[in-house]
UniProtKB/Swiss-Prot annotation:
The lineage of its organism: Bacteria, Pseudomonadati, Pseudomonadota, Gammaproteobacteria, Enterobacterales. The keyword Metal-binding applies. Zn(2+) 1 binds at residues 110, 113, 120, 211. Binds 2 Zn(2+) ions per subunit. Zn(2+) ion 1 is bound in the active site. Zn(2+) ion 2 is bound at the dimer interface by residues from both subunits. Dimer. The keyword Protease applies. It comes from Klebsiella pneumoniae subsp. pneumoniae (strain ATCC 700721 / MGH 78578). Its cofactor is Zn(2+). This is Penicillin-insensitive murein endopeptidase. Disulfide bonds join 44-265, 187-235, 216-223. GO terms for molecular function: metal ion binding; metalloendopeptidase activity; serine-type endopeptidase activity. Pfam families: Peptidase_M74 (PF03411). One of its GO terms (cellular component) is outer membrane-bounded periplasmic space.
Amino acid sequence: MKNTVIALLALLASAGSLAATPWQKITQPIGGSAQSIGAFSNGCIVGAEALPLSAPGYQVMRTDQRRYFGHPDLVQFIQRLSNQVHNKGMGTVLIGDMGMPAGGRFNGGHASHQTGLDVDIFLQLPQTRWTSSQLLKPQALDLVASDGKHVVPSLWSPQISQLIKLAAEDSEVTRIFVNPAIKQQLCLDAGSDRQWLRKVRPWFQHRAHMHVRLRCPAGSLECEDQAPPPPGDGCGAELQSWFEPPKPGSTPPVKKTPPPLPPSCQALLDEHVL
């Protein structure tokens, strides 16, 4: 996992330097009623909407990458969440990657974000709106200590817990991925109101942002939902297992070959990519 802001920014920069995928050649949404197709890590979208690039409650980062498209449900979720944050005077929500105009596989940085139902949101809430140069080259705030087991106390705030909780309490949200150390801090902060913690899942990296995932929309018949998270708040043995050293003799997982596209997504590529 990355341990510094510099490393986080290097990861973002490297994603843009890799060879383009066919999906990046589709520069506008595919016309039609909104349909998320396939799985979050192997799919596409018809009828995506562009998130308006600025609103009173949020700003969109790295707009030059054109990753601000998603299912209308995702656009509406971002607007709901940012309105809540704005009305509470918590600051400005910083929106990172959503998806490309037709969804599909990125050239780097993400395995998912393919069906228009995922969004990355920075875990910082500036009181002063960022300038255009700050938005194009955002400074990620690494909240995780160098030991990987705790958050940095001077960087953590109750507002970050509240931001994640507001997102988790939205009925359209099924999962929120954060670093295990961030999940652990949320468990400590939560008090007796813990039902929302079930949706917050520990995952690699995610030291400066949360990755929010929505459920498959009712009208998207070819969309594949994940199984629900396990029962409970996820603050027990499962979470602690993330902090254990690797078992002797364990080897890193082998990178898998991407599976074939869903037929409907392959048909979109065949029709729209020369």
